[in-house]
From Swiss-Prot:
Catalytic activity: L-homoserine + acetyl-CoA = O-acetyl-L-homoserine + CoA
HAMAP family: MetX_acyltransf (MF_00296)
Pfam families, per database record: Abhydrolase_1
Gene: metXA
BP-aspect Gene Ontology terms: homoserine metabolic process; methionine biosynthetic process
Subunit note: Homodimer.
Residues reported to bind substrate: 237, 379
Name used for this protein in its record: Homoserine O-acetyltransferase
Subcellular location: Cytoplasm
Active site: 166, 345, 378
Gene Ontology molecular function: homoserine O-acetyltransferase activity
Metabolic or biological pathway: Amino-acid biosynthesis; L-methionine biosynthesis via de novo pathway; O-acetyl-L-homoserine from L-homoserine: step 1/1
């Protein structure tokens, strides 16, 4: 397979005033590009909550390595490599792909873990050199504005498309709302115009897990010899992973299988938790082992304060803000839209994407809502390239008339308009026991 030019860097964009009214004197945005710019072939990819600018693999091996706060690992490293690349759905031999780490994150863009200017006047001076919780509150709107600033810096005007999944899909919707004249097509995958109450509740518990960790120390855990709140961050991530999987996929992957009775007598993973008092009698199950494994890896690569900031940005996003309805918010957009949803995703449901499709249709925007029958849950947009790729590829080339693009016909909440489910759309059981 042929290689394509890739580039990466950190752009210093000058003073940036956030939607909250607070500012940083020089916003730095870490970015990556793939392909060659020909003037009208730019596809902006918006990463999900804990993703990074490293959307696809680079021909340079050192670009595919990294550790917390500087490089990428796990989902953050080449997190959509099955979709972005030569000959793939977002074909980097045709498109100039740009992906930028969002403000508030920790992969090179300015965020809580970044060094703050020494001459910065703060009401309470932290005893370390990082922004910490003095960093301004971040919103999805700030992500879109920082991306527009970065594209201006790169000499890019109008975009062929903006593509993203999960909260990255919210980022996409904000582009259609805020910069309707700057983009031809938008692709919002597994997303919604706002979170529902159940997701808000789970995110709140995740943030409390971090804040309850004594090592969080009010967000002031930076500096030599200070332990990070890894236990709290790990628990927060475990809550997230439960949200990302469907009931059916968890049963298929793990069931009630034991990972070994002896495992629970040790401290659980490296999370610092004491063993359960009943550990000698009951099994340590595979689903617990999976959650511990995911949590340990995540704590090594992500910043706890960034998790607080980014989940709050996701929670607070409302597409209709400043407008009466979602349709009003999208009224100025004159391009085409593709929405993709997954039948077993209870984090961002099929119904929520149907509602967005209705909002686009209300403003006569050509739109398709492509529903994928999958039991993978919210993670499907990352792990099912064979289903995500074809409609995405054809939409970028042909719009809503693309051969692999289907539409639910505006079925909305009518189950007869899409494949039958084998799961409950809401995990009420997560609030029990």
């Amino acid at each position: 397979m042929s290689t394509v030019p890739t580039d990466h860097g950190v752009a210093a964009l000058g003073e940036f005033v956030f939607e909250c009214g607070q500012s940083v004197p020089d916003l730095e945005v870490a970015y990556e590009t793939h392909g060659e710019f020909d003037g009208d072939n730019v596809v902006l990819v918006c990463h999900a909550l804990t993703g990074s600018q490293n959307v696809a693999r680079s021909p340079a091996p050192e670009r595919n390595e990294g550790t917390r706060g500087a490089g990428q690992a796990g989902q953050a490293r080449a997190w959509w490599d099955d979709i972005v690349g030569p000959g793939k759905a977002i074909d980097t031999t045709k498109y100039y792909v740009v992906c930028a780490n969002v403000p508030g994150s920790c992969y090179g863009t300015t965020g809580p873990a970044s060094e703050r200017p020494a001459d910065l006047d703060l009401p309470e001076e932290p005893d370390h050199d990082r922004w910490g919780t003095a960093f301004p509150p971040v919103q999805v709107e700030d992500w879109a504005r920082s991306q527009r600033r970065l594209l201006d810096h790169l000499g890019v005007g109008r975009l062929r498309a903006v593509v993203g999944g999960s909260v990255g899909g919210m980022n996409v919707l904000e582009w259609a709302k805020r910069y309707p004249d700057d983009v031809d097509r938008v692709v919002a995958i597994a997303t919604a115009g706002r979170l529902d109450a159940q997701c808000l509740a789970l995110d709140a518990v995740a943030r409390r897990a971090i804040r309850a960790d004594p090592n969080w120390n009010g967000g002031n855990y930076y500096g030599e010899g200070r332990p990070s709140p890894d236990e709290g961050l790990a628990l927060a991530r475990q809550i997230g992973h439960i949200m990302y999987l469907s009931k059916a996929s968890m049963e298929r992957k793990f069931g009630r299988r034991s990972a070994g009775r002896d495992s629970l007598t040790r401290e659980e993973g490296d999370l610092g938790l004491p063993p359960e008092p009943t550990a000698a009698f009951f099994p340590y199950r595979e689903v617990e082992s999976y959650l511990d494994y995911q949590a340990e890896g995540f704590s090594e690569r992500f910043d706890a304060n960034s998790y607080l900031y980014l989940t709050r940005a996701m929670d607070e996003y409302d597409l209709s803000a400043g407008h009466g309805t979602d349709a009003d918010a999208l009224a100025a957009f004159e391009g085409e839209a593709l929405l993709m949803s997954f039948t077993a995703d209870w984090h961002f449901t099929v119904e929520q994407s149907s509602s967005l499709a209705a909002a686009f249709r209300d403003r006569d925007v050509p739109v398709a809502h492509h529903v994928i029958d999958s039991d993978h849950g919210h993670d499907a947009f990352l792990v099912e390239p064979e289903h995500v790729g074809p409609p995405l590829r054809d939409f970028l080339v042909e719009g809503v008339g693309g051969r692999a693009v289907s539409d639910d016909g505006g079925g909305g909440g009518n189950d007869s308009a899409r494949p039958e489910r084998d799961h409950a759309p809401v995990h009420a059981s997560l609030f029990k026991g």
